[in-house]
Amino acid sequence: MEWTVWWDMRRHPGEAQWSRAVEKTQAEALDRAHRFLKLGFVVYQIRDTNGAVFMDEVQITQHFGNAS
């Protein structure tokens, strides 16, 4: 089972353009998303092990606040 972080270096419309990072746990996925935000990347969503959206872009931004 894996958690998926959908992200990109700059904003692209449509999921087909997004990059994907895979982690084994929720904590690792959140940590990866936080690191991407600190680098100035766009984090679109985090999906859980069932493929359901765990956090969308707005929720991720609210969760981490100003990541820099």
Describe each model-derived feature in a short phrase.
Residues 1-18, 47:
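Short aromatic-glycine-(Arg/Gly/Cys) micro-motifs in beta-strand/loop hairpins
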